[in-house]
Structure formats: C-alpha cells, structure tokens
C-alpha cells in the first residue's frame, strides 16, 4: 500500500520577509488586522527552499523580472551575466548568497491540495486584499451510470 505524501503547504499562506523591510511589516500588519492566517519565512535567516522558489516561479507572470529588486541590476553590471540567463539552480544559489536581490515581501498562498494559487510581490494596499477572499476549490462532479 502506498502512503500518501503529506503536503505541509496545503491551505497555508506564507509571507517571505527580511526583518528590516518596512513593506514586509506592512503586509504582516495587514494580515493581523484582518485576522488572516499566515506563516512568516525570513529568507535572510533561513534560505528559501528549492520547492518554494519553484512555486514562486510557477506563479510569476513574467518569469524572474518581477522577483528581483534594483540590486539585481548591480549584479548584472558587476558580472557580464544576466539574471535571465541563469538556470533555476543557479538562481537559487544566487538568492541564497545575496537575498537582498529579491523584492519583498513575497506572499504566496496554497490551496487545500498544496498547489500554489496566489502570489503578490511587494506591498500594495489594494492588491493585498486578494488574500481576504477564499480560494475557490474545483467541484468534483459525480457521473451517474
């Protein structure tokens, strides 16, 4: 009998932060004020996992473009390498070495099956309200024979 793998992200919202980030503090305050559940992940203290980074990429509408701050441009000018040219393992390594290149906060929400469904990067008072709405789960129809 196969054991079903438990997904620890199921139904959760994660706020990826750095401690000194004022936008991160605004996002946390918003979640507190609206009684929304969340888990904080400080990626300066504990690096972003490969899985979490891949989940973030899966929800990014423009690849890596919106993920990186202006500091990423400094990396481009110091090396002849563009962030867009890096492989995913190279990006993860770079982020672990220089977490300040990521925009913050990154808020990612998973459905009850543990599939990443929503993400916002940075703090925007209007856009963050999307996390107040529940995720719509697909309804399973039974077919009568």
From Swiss-Prot:
The keyword Disulfide bond applies. Keywords: Disulfide bond, Oxidoreductase, Redox-active center. Coiled coil: none annotated. GO terms for molecular function: oxidoreductase activity. PROSITE patterns: ARSC. Disulfide bonds join 21-24. InterPro entries: Arsenate_reductase-like, Thioredoxin-like_sf, Tscrpt_reg_Spx/MgsR. The keyword Disulfide bond applies. It holds the Pfam family ArsC. Belongs to the ArsC family. PANTHER family: ARSENATE REDUCTASE, GLOBAL TRANSCRIPTIONAL REGULATOR SPX. This is Uncharacterized protein MG127 homolog. It comes from Mycoplasma pneumoniae (strain ATCC 29342 / M129 / Subtype 1).
């Amino acid at each position: 009998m196969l054991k079903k793998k438990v997904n620890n992200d199921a139904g959760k919202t994660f706020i990826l932060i750095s401690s000194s980030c004022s936008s991160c503090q605004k996002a946390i305050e918003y979640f507190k004020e609206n009684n929304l559940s969340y888990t904080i992940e400080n990626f300066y203290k504990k690096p972003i996992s490969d899985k979490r980074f891949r989940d973030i990429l899966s929800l990014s509408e423009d690849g890596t473009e919106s993920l990186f701050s202006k500091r990423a441009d400094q990396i481009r000018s110091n090396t002849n390498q563009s962030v867009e040219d890096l492989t995913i393992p190279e990006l993860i390594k770079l982020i672990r070495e220089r977490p300040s290149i990521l925009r913050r906060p990154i808020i990612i929400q998973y459905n009850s099956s543990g599939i990443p469904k929503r993400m916002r990067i940075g703090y925007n008072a209007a856009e963050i309200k999307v996390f107040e709405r529940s995720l719509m789960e697909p309804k399973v129809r039974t077919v009568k024979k």
